[in-house]
Amino acid sequence: MKIEELDVVKLKDGREGAIVYRFDDDHFMFEAKDDYDLKLPTISMSDIEEVTWKVSEH
């Protein structure tokens, strides 16, 4: 699965958010909003369960 900047993904832990930066083919900065604040963790391909929206298709 190819992940691009601005794709929306669902993580295995249930969070959903947008890819805001792609470091390489396996590491990304992920923007997730929770009840308290905006978080920008770095995630890897193994954290991603599915792509729910592809920027290239819109």
Task: Explain the meaning of each model-derived region.
Residues 2-57:
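Basic/aromatic-rich interaction segments and small domains that mediate binding to polyanionic partners
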